[in-house]
Amino acid sequence: MKKLKILLFLCVVACTLTVQAQKQFTLNSPDGKLQTTITVGDKLTYDIHCDGRQILASSPISMTLENGEVWGEKAKLAGTSGKKVDQMIPSPFYRANELRDYYNELTLRFKKDWNVEFRAYNDGIAYRFVSRSKKPFNVVDETVDYRFPSDMVASVPYVKAGKDGDYESQYFNSFENTYTTDRLSKLNKKRLMFLPLVVDAGEGVKICITESGLENYPGLYLSAAEGEKRLTGQFAPYPKKTVQGGHN
Protein backbone atom coordinates (compact mmCIF):
# COMPACT_ATOMS: atom_id res chain seq x y z
CA MET A 1 0.00 0.00 0.00
CA LYS A 2 2.86 2.35 0.77
CA LYS A 3 4.41 1.72 -2.62
CA LEU A 4 1.09 2.42 -4.28
CA LYS A 5 0.84 5.77 -2.51
CA ILE A 6 4.34 6.70 -3.63
CA LEU A 7 3.60 5.75 -7.22
CA LEU A 8 0.37 7.72 -7.18
CA PHE A 9 2.16 10.71 -5.70
CA LEU A 10 4.87 10.57 -8.34
CA CYS A 11 2.24 10.28 -11.05
CA VAL A 12 0.35 13.30 -9.73
CA VAL A 13 3.56 15.34 -9.52
CA ALA A 14 4.54 14.36 -13.06
CA CYS A 15 1.11 15.27 -14.41
CA THR A 16 1.19 18.57 -12.55
CA LEU A 17 4.59 19.43 -13.97
CA THR A 18 3.41 18.58 -17.48
CA VAL A 19 0.38 20.84 -17.15
CA GLN A 20 2.46 23.65 -15.70
CA ALA A 21 4.96 23.35 -18.56
CA GLN A 22 2.23 23.99 -21.13
CA LYS A 23 1.50 27.52 -22.28
CA GLN A 24 -1.76 28.57 -23.88
CA PHE A 25 -2.51 31.56 -26.08
CA THR A 26 -5.89 32.72 -27.34
CA LEU A 27 -6.46 34.59 -30.59
CA ASN A 28 -9.84 36.06 -31.57
CA SER A 29 -11.16 37.22 -34.92
CA PRO A 30 -11.81 40.97 -35.26
CA ASP A 31 -15.56 40.46 -34.72
CA GLY A 32 -14.95 38.10 -31.77
CA LYS A 33 -16.95 35.19 -33.21
CA LEU A 34 -14.01 32.92 -34.02
CA GLN A 35 -11.44 31.92 -31.42
CA THR A 36 -8.41 29.65 -31.56
CA THR A 37 -6.48 28.47 -28.52
CA ILE A 38 -2.86 27.48 -29.21
CA THR A 39 -1.13 25.20 -26.72
CA VAL A 40 2.66 24.91 -26.53
CA GLY A 41 3.86 21.82 -24.65
CA ASP A 42 5.17 18.42 -25.67
CA LYS A 43 3.24 19.09 -28.87
CA LEU A 44 2.03 22.24 -30.58
CA THR A 45 -1.75 22.14 -30.93
CA TYR A 46 -4.66 24.45 -31.69
CA ASP A 47 -8.45 24.29 -31.60
CA ILE A 48 -11.22 26.48 -32.98
CA HIS A 49 -14.45 27.75 -31.43
CA CYS A 50 -17.24 29.56 -33.29
CA ASP A 51 -19.62 31.62 -31.14
CA GLY A 52 -18.34 29.70 -28.11
CA ARG A 53 -18.93 26.25 -29.65
CA GLN A 54 -15.98 24.01 -30.46
CA ILE A 55 -15.86 23.13 -34.16
CA LEU A 56 -12.29 21.80 -34.27
CA ALA A 57 -10.86 19.80 -31.37
CA SER A 58 -7.25 20.18 -30.25
CA SER A 59 -5.18 19.26 -33.32
CA PRO A 60 -1.38 18.85 -33.54
CA ILE A 61 0.87 20.50 -36.11
CA SER A 62 4.60 20.04 -36.71
CA MET A 63 7.29 20.08 -39.37
CA THR A 64 10.27 17.70 -39.58
CA LEU A 65 13.54 18.79 -41.20
CA GLU A 66 16.13 16.63 -42.92
CA ASN A 67 18.54 17.07 -39.99
CA GLY A 68 16.01 15.45 -37.64
CA GLU A 69 14.83 18.68 -36.01
CA VAL A 70 11.07 18.79 -35.42
CA TRP A 71 9.34 22.14 -35.26
CA GLY A 72 6.39 21.69 -32.94
CA GLU A 73 7.55 18.95 -30.56
CA LYS A 74 8.91 19.90 -27.13
CA ALA A 75 9.59 23.34 -28.55
CA LYS A 76 11.08 26.06 -26.35
CA LEU A 77 9.18 29.32 -26.63
CA ALA A 78 11.34 32.45 -26.94
CA GLY A 79 8.63 35.09 -27.14
CA THR A 80 5.37 36.24 -28.69
CA SER A 81 4.05 39.23 -30.57
CA GLY A 82 0.70 40.25 -31.98
CA LYS A 83 -0.75 42.74 -34.42
CA LYS A 84 -3.98 43.80 -36.06
CA VAL A 85 -4.10 44.29 -39.83
CA ASP A 86 -6.81 46.17 -41.72
CA GLN A 87 -5.88 47.03 -45.29
CA MET A 88 -7.10 46.85 -48.86
CA ILE A 89 -5.26 44.65 -51.34
CA PRO A 90 -5.61 44.77 -55.15
CA SER A 91 -7.47 41.88 -56.77
CA PRO A 92 -7.24 42.13 -60.58
CA PHE A 93 -8.82 38.68 -61.18
CA TYR A 94 -11.82 38.99 -58.86
CA ARG A 95 -15.20 40.65 -59.37
CA ALA A 96 -14.05 43.52 -57.12
CA ASN A 97 -10.92 45.60 -57.72
CA GLU A 98 -9.90 45.40 -54.07
CA LEU A 99 -10.42 43.10 -51.11
CA ARG A 100 -10.33 43.92 -47.44
CA ASP A 101 -7.51 42.12 -45.62
CA TYR A 102 -8.68 42.22 -42.02
CA TYR A 103 -7.32 39.94 -39.29
CA ASN A 104 -5.61 39.60 -35.92
CA GLU A 105 -2.24 37.86 -35.87
CA LEU A 106 -0.25 36.07 -33.17
CA THR A 107 3.39 35.11 -33.76
CA LEU A 108 5.06 32.51 -31.55
CA ARG A 109 8.86 32.67 -31.69
CA PHE A 110 10.84 29.56 -30.77
CA LYS A 111 14.47 29.20 -29.77
CA LYS A 112 15.69 27.28 -32.82
CA ASP A 113 15.15 30.02 -35.39
CA TRP A 114 11.56 29.32 -36.33
CA ASN A 115 8.15 30.86 -35.77
CA VAL A 116 4.52 29.91 -36.13
CA GLU A 117 2.13 32.63 -37.25
CA PHE A 118 -1.59 32.29 -36.54
CA ARG A 119 -4.18 34.57 -38.09
CA ALA A 120 -7.83 34.94 -37.12
CA TYR A 121 -10.12 36.41 -39.77
CA ASN A 122 -13.85 36.95 -39.37
CA ASP A 123 -14.42 33.94 -41.62
CA GLY A 124 -11.42 31.71 -40.96
CA ILE A 125 -8.32 30.66 -39.05
CA ALA A 126 -4.92 30.23 -40.71
CA TYR A 127 -1.39 29.31 -39.66
CA ARG A 128 2.05 28.88 -41.19
CA PHE A 129 5.58 27.94 -40.15
CA VAL A 130 8.29 30.57 -40.75
CA SER A 131 12.07 30.06 -40.64
CA ARG A 132 14.28 32.84 -39.30
CA SER A 133 17.43 31.12 -40.53
CA LYS A 134 19.14 32.34 -43.69
CA LYS A 135 20.45 28.84 -44.46
CA PRO A 136 18.51 26.58 -46.85
CA PHE A 137 16.89 23.45 -45.43
CA ASN A 138 14.81 20.50 -46.58
CA VAL A 139 11.47 19.50 -45.10
CA VAL A 140 10.95 15.72 -45.00
CA ASP A 141 7.61 15.53 -43.21
CA GLU A 142 4.77 17.65 -41.86
CA THR A 143 2.03 16.83 -39.39
CA VAL A 144 -1.40 18.17 -40.31
CA ASP A 145 -4.23 16.60 -38.35
CA TYR A 146 -7.81 17.90 -38.23
CA ARG A 147 -9.59 16.39 -35.23
CA PHE A 148 -13.29 17.10 -34.92
CA PRO A 149 -15.42 17.06 -31.75
CA SER A 150 -18.12 14.86 -33.31
CA ASP A 151 -18.74 12.63 -36.31
CA MET A 152 -19.57 15.47 -38.69
CA VAL A 153 -20.68 15.20 -42.30
CA ALA A 154 -18.03 16.02 -44.91
CA SER A 155 -18.17 16.67 -48.65
CA VAL A 156 -14.91 15.51 -50.21
CA PRO A 157 -13.37 14.97 -53.67
CA TYR A 158 -11.48 11.67 -53.85
CA VAL A 159 -8.49 11.20 -56.13
CA LYS A 160 -9.61 9.00 -59.04
CA ALA A 161 -6.16 7.85 -60.20
CA GLY A 162 -4.04 5.09 -58.67
CA LYS A 163 -4.71 1.93 -56.69
CA ASP A 164 -6.83 1.68 -53.55
CA GLY A 165 -4.65 1.91 -50.45
CA ASP A 166 -1.55 2.93 -52.44
CA TYR A 167 -1.22 6.65 -51.77
CA GLU A 168 1.98 6.96 -53.79
CA SER A 169 0.17 5.89 -56.95
CA GLN A 170 -2.57 8.46 -56.28
CA TYR A 171 -0.36 11.55 -56.08
CA PHE A 172 -0.21 11.91 -59.87
CA ASN A 173 -3.76 12.93 -60.77
CA SER A 174 -5.86 15.53 -62.55
CA PHE A 175 -7.54 17.02 -59.43
CA GLU A 176 -10.94 16.42 -61.01
CA ASN A 177 -13.85 14.55 -59.48
CA THR A 178 -17.36 15.01 -58.14
CA TYR A 179 -17.82 15.45 -54.38
CA THR A 180 -18.91 12.61 -52.10
CA THR A 181 -20.83 13.37 -48.90
CA ASP A 182 -20.64 11.13 -45.84
CA ARG A 183 -19.80 11.14 -42.15
CA LEU A 184 -16.12 11.43 -41.22
CA SER A 185 -16.06 7.92 -39.78
CA LYS A 186 -17.38 6.46 -43.04
CA LEU A 187 -15.05 8.17 -45.52
CA ASN A 188 -12.97 5.91 -47.77
CA LYS A 189 -9.64 5.41 -46.00
CA LYS A 190 -8.07 3.88 -49.15
CA ARG A 191 -8.41 7.04 -51.24
CA LEU A 192 -6.68 10.38 -50.92
CA MET A 193 -8.79 13.54 -50.93
CA PHE A 194 -7.70 16.80 -52.51
CA LEU A 195 -8.64 20.36 -51.58
CA PRO A 196 -10.84 22.20 -51.03
CA LEU A 197 -13.21 20.07 -49.00
CA VAL A 198 -16.01 21.02 -46.63
CA VAL A 199 -17.04 19.71 -43.21
CA ASP A 200 -20.51 20.58 -41.90
CA ALA A 201 -20.17 21.64 -38.25
CA GLY A 202 -23.93 22.12 -37.81
CA GLU A 203 -25.96 25.19 -36.84
CA GLY A 204 -25.23 26.75 -40.22
CA VAL A 205 -21.43 26.56 -39.84
CA LYS A 206 -19.37 25.02 -42.65
CA ILE A 207 -15.62 24.40 -42.36
CA CYS A 208 -13.78 24.70 -45.67
CA ILE A 209 -10.23 23.30 -45.57
CA THR A 210 -7.84 24.74 -48.15
CA GLU A 211 -4.37 26.27 -48.48
CA SER A 212 -2.67 29.19 -50.21
CA GLY A 213 0.72 30.77 -50.84
CA LEU A 214 2.52 27.54 -51.79
CA GLU A 215 5.98 27.89 -53.33
CA ASN A 216 8.42 24.99 -53.85
CA TYR A 217 6.29 22.83 -51.58
CA PRO A 218 3.89 19.94 -52.25
CA GLY A 219 0.17 20.53 -52.01
CA LEU A 220 -1.82 19.00 -49.18
CA TYR A 221 -3.90 15.86 -49.55
CA LEU A 222 -6.04 14.43 -46.76
CA SER A 223 -6.81 10.87 -45.75
CA ALA A 224 -9.41 9.37 -43.43
CA ALA A 225 -8.99 6.83 -40.64
CA GLU A 226 -11.67 4.16 -40.49
CA GLY A 227 -14.16 4.75 -37.70
CA GLU A 228 -12.49 7.98 -36.58
CA LYS A 229 -13.62 11.59 -36.74
CA ARG A 230 -10.45 13.14 -38.08
CA LEU A 231 -8.61 13.93 -41.31
CA THR A 232 -4.84 13.50 -41.65
CA GLY A 233 -2.51 15.36 -44.00
CA GLN A 234 -0.54 13.52 -46.68
CA PHE A 235 2.19 15.13 -48.79
CA ALA A 236 3.67 13.93 -52.07
CA PRO A 237 7.39 13.20 -51.57
CA TYR A 238 10.06 14.69 -53.83
CA PRO A 239 10.48 12.37 -56.85
CA LYS A 240 13.76 10.47 -57.26
CA LYS A 241 13.42 10.72 -61.03
CA THR A 242 11.21 12.71 -63.38
CA VAL A 243 10.05 11.57 -66.82
CA GLN A 244 8.49 13.70 -69.53
CA GLY A 245 4.80 12.83 -69.70
CA GLY A 246 2.27 13.12 -72.49
CA HIS A 247 -1.07 12.01 -73.80
CA ASN A 248 -0.07 10.36 -77.10
Give residue ranges: language-model regions.
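Bacterial Sec-dependent N-terminal signal peptides
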Residues: M1-Q24
